[in-house]
Swiss-Prot record:
Cofactor binding, per record: Manganese or magnesium. Binds 1 divalent metal ion per monomer in the absence of substrate. May bind a second metal ion after substrate binding.
GO cellular component, as recorded: cytoplasm; ribonuclease H2 complex
EC number: 3.1.26.4
Reaction equations catalysed: Endonucleolytic cleavage to 5'-phosphomonoester
Family, similarity comment: Belongs to the RNase HII family.
Organism phylogeny: Bacteria, Pseudomonadati, Pseudomonadota, Gammaproteobacteria, Enterobacterales
Name the record gives this protein: Ribonuclease HII
Pfam families: RNase_HII
Coiled coil: none
Sample GO molecular function, one term: RNA-DNA hybrid ribonuclease activity
Positions that bind a divalent metal cation: D16, E17, D108
Length: 199
């Protein structure tokens, strides 16, 4: 892994996404500029934290960060653009939504969206960079809450448990009940459930 050097500038935003792999719902992104005067203890990759810890940190991030913003790309945008381009669009939206313009943006992963300020992709940034960790927590808590809401509307799919990922249970329910309007029609298992697959 390449050595990461934190940029020597004041206003650094971290950006991360949640929801590239699921078959249903939006891909959700977050951008966060932390306040050096208000450190937050325990920031880490959201996937490595318990749900209870994520929720507590989410509240603390919203309270202490200089600013934060959420972005998203809806299922129809994912189907039109493909998941990679839709994710880049959602990241751009999160950065554009910040009330303070960052001087530098650090993105989790290996590629950056086109932004009007300097940016750098950081592999495993969600466990290496506090701003990206904070963004990953906001994005995951937001998307998980959306899946819980969707679960209330469509209780037989189990969205609250699998968050829309292609688990055996989700694939079985897709076969039994078909796709909802929230499913991503360009994804293979959904295509097959709708009878749209060419194979």
């Amino acid at each position: 892994m390449m050595e990461f050097v934190y940029p020597h500038t004041h206003l650094v935003a971290g950006v991360d996404e949640v929801g590239r792999g699921p078959l249903v719902g939006a891909v959700v992104t977050a951008a966060v500029i932390l306040d050096p005067a208000k450190p937050i203890v325990g920031l880490n990759d959201s996937k490595k934290l318990s749900e209870k810890r994520r929720l507590a940190l989410c509240d603390e991030i919203k309270e202490k960060a200089l600013c934060w913003s959420l972005g998203r790309a809806e299922p129809h945008e994912i189907d039109e653009l493909n998941i990679l381009h839709a994710t880049m669009l959602a990241m751009q939206r999160a950065v554009a939504g910040l009330s303070i313009v960052p001087e530098f943006v650090l993105i989790d992963g290996n590629r950056c969206p086109s932004l009007p300020m300097p940016s750098l992709a950081v592999v495993k940034g969600d466990s290496r960079v506090a701003e990206i960790s904070a963004a990953s927590i906001l994005a995951k808590v937001t998307r998980d809450a959306e899946m819980a809401t969707l679960d209330l509307a469509f209780p037989h799919y189990g969205f609250a448990q699998h968050k829309g990922y292609p688990t055996a249970v989700h694939l079985q329910k897709l076969q039994e009940h078909g796709a909802t309007e929230h499913h991503r029609r360009s994804f293979g298992p959904v295509k097959r459930a709708l009878g749209l697959a060419s194979n």
